[in-house]
Amino acid sequence: MIPGVREATAGHEPVKAELWKRIYSRVGSHWKGLILAVLLMAGAAATQPTLAVIMKPLIDGGFAGDKPQYIWSVPLAVIGLILLRGVCNFFSDYLLAWVANNVLLGIRREMFDRLLGLPDADFKRGDTGRLLNRFTIDAGNVTGYATDVITVLVRETLVVISLIAVLLYMSWLLTVIILVVMPISVWIARSFARRLRRINRETVNMNAELTRVVSEGIDGQRVIKLFDGYEAERGRFAYVNARLRRFAMRTAVADAALTPLTQVCIAVAVGAVIAVALGQANAGTLTAGAFAAFMSALAQIFDPIKRLTNLASKMQKMLVSAESVFTLVDQIPEVDEGQRTLAEPVRGKIEFRQIGHRFPEADRNTISDVSFTVEPGQTVALVGRSGSGKTTLVNMLPRFVLPTEGSILIDDVPINDVQLNSLRSHLSLVSQDVVLFDDTIAANVGYGALGKADDQRIHDALAAANLRDFVDSLPKGIHTPVGENAARLSGGQRQRLAIARALIKNAPILILDEATSALDNESERQVQSSLDRLMRGRTTLVIAHRLSTVQNADRIIVLDAGRIVEHGAHTELLAAGGLYATLYNMQFRED
């Protein structure tokens, strides 16, 4: 789950009722397919008691030899009934699968829409494995079990009711014996339901934990190899895997115990039925055909009763998964109270006024009383030790982080008054951690123009980013897939691809977040050349670790413990001999 978000309170009736309502309101929106499926299930259910009823005339008339017409009519009737049941079951199952998959489509779309609208802070705190499980496992469980519940409730209930009617018609006394057992079976099922729900919830959480451990094993495989972390990772995986096995076995024990206990109750009833039936036969009140029909109906009623008793387990799994799914759906989306749009053309003037910020769990401000102005077309660099507040401050510009004090203005308009779409459409970002999608080079570069860039614009952007020659050397050119996490590209190539994407967007304000800090000298030279082209004519905020990359900035702002301690040009700050000079000299000696 995403921390800080309250899960639904398990086991409380109002919560359960709300979950049922939310699940089946979505299923019910496909009511035409649902009604047709129910009618087909009713048709299939009607064939079972009919098969039992046939047994009476077959035994009493057909085997007695005085009804020769039964030689052909009864076998044909049996074949016809089985064929009818098969056709009805096929189309009802198809329709329910259609309903389930359409509901799943809608739920996943709803989940993903909410995911995209979550505040940036929620992703910082999130558990990726748990989040992925909601899409891949929980959503499927909700729709799959929801339609399974309908199938069992409708088809099996109709079968049981119709078979009970046959039993009553054949012998009410024998039927009473059977009906005495049913409440006992229901009580057993309900007693297991609460336990199953608790176990299922724990199993869902452990599945998410397993996903997280495996994901970290994949993402961190180089670190694991270099630091010889094999045993540590095996130990982490073994611990989670063993706990998951224990939960699975507890579920299996509960599921396995439910069926035999129910069957024992039924076996006692069958024994009593046989004893009473023999007494009625000897008294001449029950024929062999009637008893055969009764036993046929009784034999057919066991499976639907078993499925109905097992329904409790499916319901609990459905509700547990629904809690997880709707926890995401109910997340509070990113706040967008802006009513204005930035007037075109945006000049790019940025003003930070007395900005302060404190994280919810912190006991002091991470940023305090920060004020500065960036004129249109200027490049301003933010430097300082790690943790000085540089990234937090810059992330306030696209409103990924909200200041707790002060305000930020673009072209003299407070950004809180600007619609998020309008604000962010005028910003571009190139960061150290480049995010590229598992698609082609053209698709990733064209992403900056919302996919509306033609091949010529993409080629021009690649040329400006010093990447055209490399791309042209590829067999598929711009249509070459970059692979997952752009694994087929080097670090420098990924950075230049991100620069090309920013060039395509052509936003007037640019944010560079340590864009060259993870590169070697040659890659840094190529990327810096591309950045110089990108920065021309744009208002640029630069976060830099390597101070050599910001010497040409119009102004350098030095942060320490969330406060501005120095500002000026590179030569001025060196001459002042303050924190900037100290940091620069340390890096110069290291280089």
Swiss-Prot record:
Residues 35-317 form the ABC transmembrane type-1 domain. The keyword Oxidoreductase does not apply. It is found in: Cell inner membrane. It is an enzyme of class 7 (translocase). Residues 350-586 form the ABC transporter domain. Its EC number is 7.5.2.6. Its main location: membrane. InterPro entries: AAA+_ATPase, ABC1_TM_dom, ABC1_TM_sf, ABC_transporter-like_ATP-bd, ABC_transporter-like_CS, ABC_transpr_lipidA, P-loop_NTPase, Type_1_exporter. It catalyses: ATP + H2O + lipid A-core oligosaccharideSide 1 = ADP + phosphate + lipid A-core oligosaccharideSide 2. GO terms for cellular component: plasma membrane. Homodimer. PANTHER family: ATP-BINDING CASSETTE SUB-FAMILY B MEMBER 10, MITOCHONDRIAL, ATP-DEPENDENT PERMEASE MDL1, MITOCHONDRIAL. Belongs to the ABC transporter superfamily. Lipid exporter (TC 3.A.1.106) family. This is ATP-dependent lipid A-core flippase.
